[in-house]
Amino acid sequence: MAPAASGAKKQKKKWSKGKVKDKAQHAVILDKSTSDKLYKDVQSYRLVTVATLVDRLKINGSLARRCLKDLEEKGQIKQVVGHSKMKIYTRAIGADE
């Protein structure tokens, strides 16, 4: 019984307060400057996903998905992986087609 009692004297772990992440204020509507940046810069990206557009252009996820669909219809990007949760695109190169 003595060894069990000595184990209880261990100091309790103090919990940290945790970090609070600021809420992102990303654009919900595609304005002219963001649209120009999208069409110009996306040709240099090797990997294009919703997350890359959200991170680089500061737009929200639903807008990024619509942009990807539009870029694919215009032939600027092509789909590499189509999954129910994530679609991965790459830049379309004329020699591939």
Swiss-Prot record:
SUPFAM superfamilies: Winged helix' DNA-binding domain. Residues 1-24 are annotated as: Disordered. GO terms for molecular function: structural constituent of ribosome. It is found in: Cytoplasm. Keywords: Cytoplasm, Ribonucleoprotein, Ribosomal protein. The keyword Ribonucleoprotein applies. GO terms for cellular component: cytosolic small ribosomal subunit. Its main location: cytoplasm. Coiled coil: none annotated. Residues 9-18 have a biased composition (Basic residues). Gene3D superfamilies: 3.30.63.20. It comes from the Eukaryota. InterPro entries: Ribosomal_eS25, WH_DNA-bd_sf. Component of the small ribosomal subunit (SSU). Mature N.crassa ribosomes consist of a small (40S) and a large (60S) subunit. The 40S small subunit contains 1 molecule of ribosomal RNA (18S rRNA) and at least 32 different proteins. The large 60S subunit contains 3 rRNA molecules (26S, 5.8S and 5S rRNA) and at least 42 different proteins. Component of the ribosome, a large ribonucleoprotein complex responsible for the synthesis of proteins in the cell. The small ribosomal subunit (SSU) binds messenger RNAs (mRNAs) and translates the encoded message by selecting cognate aminoacyl-transfer RNA (tRNA) molecules. The large subunit (LSU) contains the ribosomal catalytic site termed the peptidyl transferase center (PTC), which catalyzes the formation of peptide bonds, thereby polymerizing the amino acids delivered by tRNAs into a polypeptide chain. Belongs to the eukaryotic ribosomal protein eS25 family. This is Small ribosomal subunit protein eS25. The gene is rps-25.
